[in-house]
Amino acid sequence: RFEAGLLDERDWRPSVWVGFPGAWSGAARYYQARFTAPAQVAKSRLYLSGLGWFEAFVNGKRLGDAVLDPAPTDYSQSVLYRVFDLAGLLVPGENVLAIHAGGGWHVQPIVRVQLELDGELVAKTRPFGPPSGPSGIRRNSIYGGEEFDARLEPDSTWMLPSGPILPPGRSCCRIAPPAGRMRAAMTPAVRELMELPVRSWNRLADGRFVADFGQNFAGYCRLKLTAPAGTQVSLRFAEYCNADGSVNQENLLGEEALDVYTARGDAAGEVWKPRFTYHGFRFVEVAGLPGEPGADTLTGIVVGSDCPPIGRFRTDNELLNRIDAMVAWTERSNLHGVPTDCPQRTERMGWLNDMMARNECAIFHFDEATLLRKWLRDIAEAQDPETGFVPMTAPNHWTPDKVDPVCSSFVETAWNLHLFFGERALLRELFPNFLAWCRCMEQATENQILTDGGEIGDWVPPLEFCGRNTCRSGLVPQELVATALYGYAVSLTAKIAAFLGEKDEEKRLADQLAAIRAAFHARFYRGEGKYESESQSAYSFALRCGMVPEELAGLVSQRLVERFEADKCKLTTGNIGTKYLLEALSECGRADLIFKMVNSTEYPGWGYMLANGATTLWERWELATGGGMNSHNHPMLGSVGGWFYRYLAGIRPLPDSDGFDRFELAPSFVAGLNEVEASYDSFAGKIVSHWKREAGKVAWEFTIPANSKARVSLPGDAARTFGPGTHRITV
């Protein structure tokens, strides 16, 4: 049965936003609302938003299992609310709604409530009320951590109908509302996804202890202890340690990831975990424990958007398996209402540049469709309505001076949601935004060439190939990268126009694309299949962005092969260039060269990261510590995870796919691998590709779900179409 939420601001009146004016102390706040319920209630709906984050209780029972809720947005554009069904929680007569609000991305905790029983408004936030008081959380910050004093936490009886008014009984007041429109949260909630035990403890010379969880992840810790009242235990979080074993927080860029718990002195023991912060870490330095840590003193809790795994990949090569696990852990660590760049330092933003390299890998591993729909709307809200300019992050925290086509992940991610998940309505909704973005880029060109090259380019190649005092590639011209991506965005928008039946726009975009390709070829082609700089990135961007004339594609691909072999099969590319390098070499039949690179622990590469202790992807190809750009949990170099599925297993949607109803199966039987097995829970059903060497031949078994068909391609053989079922081929 369909039910609409509160769709218009008028539906919320007379409910208002309440909080406390003035400077915020950093403390979390409790809010209490008492209301009367009849003996019989057929339908109960609580509409609730708390910024930055909230948790709610009715008669002492927690509503839902979401944490760090709601997801961040640009509060001047949208404010998300949750809807709760209170069935089974209400009692006849007086009831208590309790809300716990922390700063989150809004910083100042504010709440808005509307409760309806059988369609009648029975509780709301009023200009003066409800009663409010401080919780035991004395300080909470996304970046800085949380400080909790258990001695100051109010007795929970105030959450019960028989309990007292929330001490100290002070009423909050009406607060100027955020300008954004109230919208129901349609994105997966952030939840506690799993628990991790401490792998080992290290005692430092000064008596502090360092816990090693053996895995870098995003979340927080649960602390268990028995201690006298006033005992203060601090938890300091980091991704790596100093030579003396203490944690190193230099890469957090100035913020101290510190949780502090002050015990109330309960002889039966105390258990605590934070409510309104999270960290990216592997190591925790613990100070103030009254004794030696026990087996359950500290437990790691993995926290993130609840996007279930939908891809599984396995080979007989343990290094490749570990690389895929590293990629998956990194992606899982960076889903927090938006796809973030990192979970640990003072950033944690939805960078469009990162998503340009990451989005296919992400949706092969996790069902991120709903999360990415929300994020694409965040981008649309951040886009300049007059110029079509798209900023680097969404929700927007940083607007560059230049137009940069790396932000065309806005278009590509939407198109991939169509190919992978059958998304149609969003393409229609955002099509005007894509057109505006293409116009914006065109206006920044000189004769279809983006001469200023944008801000980012091919970001963070190996250090020796970076430009002077920059993380951009010094091997490939910025304007080549920017113009190729501009053309790619126009080509995708033309495909969307064709799918939507927008014939006039399709024709106009096709003409624009032809002009870009001609200008690109005239500006950067040097003859004999060579492009300016003759670098891996130059060839890869030209090929994968569709800038190479069809009659030259084979020759240019051969030049890329020669370049890569001359570079001893070591990459010289940045985040996007690496993705395109993997694809371009595989498309011309040289997946063997990519396998040679991936199956290595030498620098630069993913195996090198693992050989140097990584459990999640680094931001740089180098092992870096200290301040600066050196996150150790950063998904933008993870495109190899998509390559495993697309080329080793050979599972990839066709250009005319609509939710994987049509796809290609074209595995690469590379020498040195004896078995590859991958499955993907597609929108159409489960797809499996499993090949294994047996007695000098390759036995390949693949499964096509119902109502789908696959084009099966093998080297040296004409493509054939297969329908649903499990099929076996021996090569």
Describe the residue ranges of each PLM region.
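Extracellular/oxidizing-compartment recognition motifs
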Residues: 3-345, 353-354, 370-371, 387-398, ...
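Active-site-adjacent structural elements in folded domains
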Residues: 30, 81-83, 269-270, 341-346, ...
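Active/binding-pocket-proximal capping segment
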Residues: 54, 62-65, 69-70, 379, ...
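Non-catalytic C-terminal accessory modules of carbohydrate-active enzymes
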Residues: 136-162, 184-194, 510-511, 592-731
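Well-ordered alpha-helical segments within folded domains of soluble proteins
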Residues: 351-363, 372-373, 404-416, 479-494, ...
